[in-house]
Design a protein with these regions (language model features):
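Short helix-loop capping/hinge segments that flank enzyme active sites or metal/cofactor-binding pockets
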Residues: 9-60, 67, 112-124
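Short, surface-exposed loop/helix-turn segments at secondary-structure junctions
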Residues: 10, 54, 83-101
Length: 149
């Protein structure tokens, strides 16, 4: 799993599918979508079909490998983000969704819990469980929640 690479790959799929689903807004220069959304959709529209196919195959392989991990473990525990919380008034780190994207790619139930620590800025952990194993995720996360407070 390469968090940065796989997050970017997933984003390409989202932008490509968004361009297809919002094509009526994209072709209408008078539509009220933001410049940033238009730019992202245009990027997605221009991704070559063979690249999309390859990306989907790569993400499917990751999904399969991730789901196989759950044959031996109940949960995957990671930080929610690769860094501590940032100031909302400043530009956000581009990699802030690197760890959360694994749940999206692999169809995993996931949740984040704040960690009440002595660090200067907030920190949280993310728990991922096997597909359709929400019950165990909620049960174990309630234990973590008590420990982290």
């Amino acid at each position: 799993w390469n968090p940065n690479l796989h997050r970017k790959a997933l984003l390409k799929i989202v932008e490509n599918e968004g361009a297809k689903n919002l094509s009526n807004l994209l072709i209408n220069n008078k539509s009220k979508i933001t410049k940033l959304l238009r730019s992202n959709l245009e990027f997605g529209q221009n991704i070559i079909k063979t690249d999309i196919k390859r990306i989907k195959e790569d993400l499917f392989k990751l999904k399969t490998k991730t789901q196989n991990i759950f044959e031996n473990v109940d949960l995957i525990l990671t930080p929610t983000t690769p860094q501590l919380a940032s100031n909302i008034e400043k530009e956000q780190p581009l990699n802030q969704a690197n760890f959360t994207s694994l749940a999206n790619i692999s169809d995993l139930p996931a949740l984040s819990l704040p960690y009440n620590c002595t660090l200067e800025k907030p920190f949280s952990i993310q728990l991922n469980a096997a597909n359709n194993n929400d019950k165990i995720l909620l049960k174990i996360s309630s234990i973590f929640e008590k420990i982290l407070q």
